[in-house]
Amino acid sequence: MANSAQARKRARQAAKANSHNSALRSKFRTAIKAVRKAIDAGDQAKAAELFKAATKTIDTIADKKIVHKNKAARHKSRLSAAVKGLQAQAAQ
């Protein structure tokens, strides 16, 4: 329990930041799932469009240090490879 005014304020700020960061983390996961769903459906155009939007979301949360930059890079790399694989599969 926070006893001083400073500690109470820090507790309020931490709760607010936690709520905001949780929302951004959820947006990150949702963006990845949307791209994966489009890839699984075989929709090349939609997958490329959603990948572009997901990349912005992933970069944003990495810049804000909500997820580590390496984790963000790993997700972007794997999604990019999956989208390119879908395009290569469609070309054959």
Swiss-Prot record:
GO molecular function: small ribosomal subunit rRNA binding; structural constituent of ribosome
Cross-referenced SUPFAM superfamilies: Ribosomal protein S20 (SSF46992)
Record carries keyword Zinc-finger: no
The keyword Heme appears for this protein: no
An individual GO BP term: translation
Family designation: Belongs to the bacterial ribosomal protein bS20 family.
NCBIfam families per the UniProt record, alphabetical: S20
PANTHER family, alphabetized: 30S RIBOSOMAL PROTEIN S20, SMALL RIBOSOMAL SUBUNIT PROTEIN BS20C
Entry function: Binds directly to 16S ribosomal RNA.
Protein name: Small ribosomal subunit protein bS20
Organism of origin: Burkholderia mallei (strain ATCC 23344)
